[in-house]
Every structure is written in C-alpha cells, then in structure tokens.
Amino acid sequence: MFRTMMKSKIHRATVTEANLKYVGSITIDEELLEVADILPNEKVQVVNNNNGARLETYVIPGKRGERTVCLNGAAARLVQVGDEVIIIAYGIFTDEAARTYEPKVIFVDEGNNPVKIAHEEIHGQQS
C-alpha cells in the first residue's frame, strides 16, 4: 500500500505578486524552496487563508533572496497581493515509510523570511 502524505509546507506565506498574463504556476523564492525541500516543477497545493480558495499548480523558482510568492496565470484570479497562503507539497510513501517520515513545516514572517522549521503540527498551534 502507498499513502499520500504531506511532505513539506510553507506556512502563512504572503503573496507578493499575482501575474494573470503568465502561462501558469507559482513562483517561489529559490531559498524558500530549498529550505522546504520543494523542487522546481513539483506539484503543490496552495490554500488561501483570506478567501478559502484551494488550487493545485507547479512550482517555478524565483530569484534567491527576493522572497517572492507569485501566483501566475489563472491562479492569479484566486489571490490578492498581501493574501496569506499555505503552500503544501505531498509525497507518496510506502506504508512503512509513511509511519516514520517527518515532514518539514516552514513558518515564515510577513516578509516571507523563514523563522522556524518544525517536523510536526500540533492542534491549536498558531505559528
């Protein structure tokens, strides 16, 4: 049996751009991708905390250090600059691996700077 599990996420990132004219995807600062162990072209789910929208897309790396989080193409219709989003990457694990895998949860500040890395989520935890 295989299980689809949260592999990593960037928690409460701030949308810095929304580019309707781009062909698609989400652009994320290359450094944030490395910290979260998310690869270019990897499928992610984006959850908008401001309006509840959920979407799936793929990642393209943004310029290192600029802290860009930009929704491109049709996804740009689902966000506003300044919205708070959660970016989640999933992995497919064997049953055995799923029981021992520790995901990466990257907490960022309002400027999309990583401030904390956790390997679990606790109910009621705010950040």
Curated annotation (Swiss-Prot):
CDD domains, alphabetized: Asp_decarbox
Which GO terms label this protein's molecular function in UniProt? aspartate 1-decarboxylase activity
Top-level EC class as recorded in UniProt: lyase
- Gene3D superfamilies for the chain: 2.40.40.20
SUPFAM superfamilies registered for this protein in UniProt: ADC-like
Instruction: Say yes or no: keyword Lyase present.
Output: yes
Q: Which cofactor does it need?
A: pyruvate
Positions bound to substrate: T57, G73, A74, A75
Q: Tell me how the protein is altered or processed after translation.
A: Is synthesized initially as an inactive proenzyme, which is activated by self-cleavage at a specific serine bond to produce a beta-subunit with a hydroxyl group at its C-terminus and an alpha-subunit with a pyruvoyl group at its N-terminus.
Sorted alphabetically, which keywords does the UniProt record give?
Autocatalytic cleavage, Cytoplasm, Decarboxylase, Lyase, Pantothenate biosynthesis, Pyruvate, Schiff base, Zymogen
Q: What does this protein do?
A: Catalyzes the pyruvoyl-dependent decarboxylation of aspartate to produce beta-alanine.
Similarity comment: family membership: Belongs to the PanD family.
Q: HAMAP family, from UniProt?
A: PanD
Name the chain's protein. Aspartate 1-decarboxylase
Q: What is the lineage of its organism?
A: Bacteria, Bacillati, Bacillota, Clostridia, Eubacteriales
